[in-house]
Amino acid sequence: MLAKLNERRSTLNGESGFTLIELLVVLIIICVLLAIAVPSYLGFRQKAQERAAQANVRTEIPSAEAYMESSATSNYAGMNLAAITAIDAGSKLTVVKVGTAGDDYCLQSTVGGHDARYIGPAGSAGSLGAPDLSGPVLGVCP
């Protein structure tokens, strides 16, 4: 039994585990990797939210055109968020504005604090400003 205790004591006096320097080096490496990864992740998340807002607006452009085709006045007068939702129950728009003459409209969606808008139709500029010819852009309705 005494031999077993002496054997155990000799193994405990030997090197085992990591030194403080080795642990600090590993900790510094992990911190550097996190410093690189976290900003990249946040940038990807921001771009995804911006693109989601643009996709929401792009999806609802046909609903706005359908409203105009079905209206008795053949323009966008009276179009609002409720009218778009009646056409497309899955609408994710947050703002719908119509120009003073009813000849143009602005659709807006907000995802994670990022706004996207579309001013249409793609004709001449109305009271809301120049149309967004390339599709939804970042920003809010005027």
Regions found by a protein language model. Give the residues of each.
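Aliphatic-rich helix starts adjacent to a transmembrane/signal segment
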Residues: 11, 42-58, 71
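N-terminal leader/signal peptides at the extreme start of proteins
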Residues: 1-18
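N-terminal single-pass transmembrane signal-anchor helix
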Residues: 13-41
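Residues at secondary-structure transition points
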Residues: 15, 47-51, 55, 93-96, ...
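Periplasmic/extracellular, small/polar-rich flexible segments of pilin-like filament-forming proteins
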Residues: 62-142
